[in-house]
Amino acid sequence: MPQIVIPIYFDYASTLCYIAWRIVGQLEGELGFASLWKGVPIAQRTSRSRAGLPLEESELARIRGVIAETGVAVKPPARWLDSGKALEGSELAREAGAFSAYHDAIFRAAYEEEIDIGDLDALTAIAERIGIDPVRFRNEVARGGMASRVAANRAEADSFSAVGYPSFILGDFPLIGIQPIETMRMLLARFIERRAAEPQA
């Protein structure tokens, strides 16, 4: 049977998506599925999440609650990150066959190294480090060459009513948010078992 692919709609600006990335990284090999991360800018969902605005106390409290539940240590940024260029860059990385390396590097840069992922120089340096042509990367991101792909990701997420961060698509339905690894293991394993039991076309 072909490997089961689970789409995950995310944004690098979301601390909860960083936590999800950490948990998915542990479960992907264990459960044998492939994650398909698709960037959707959180700033397009709510004006409260625009780059540079401070995270509201209610958002910080929610993040602290998830950190406590999941045990994933992370310091949320004081202000919403500017992730637009990084998301477009992820589509260039996908095209270059380097999505996983780029994706990992951007999450680490934003949440572990406190690098400004809204800075094109920083993004280009990351791209070059993982083997992407830096000149093409810079030029494409600067001109918004992948904006249409990011817009298509949002339209696709909307079709599933996947408006939260992160959103896992399990069949036709979104699982919104991130749970402790034990809960995620149970939910994803149950979905994979159901899929494996379905008649193959």
Task: Name each region found by the language model.
Residues 2-33, 38, 108-201:
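C-terminal cap of thioredoxin/glutaredoxin-like
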Residues 18-113, 198-199:
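Structural alpha/beta surface segment adjacent to cysteine/selenocysteine redox centers
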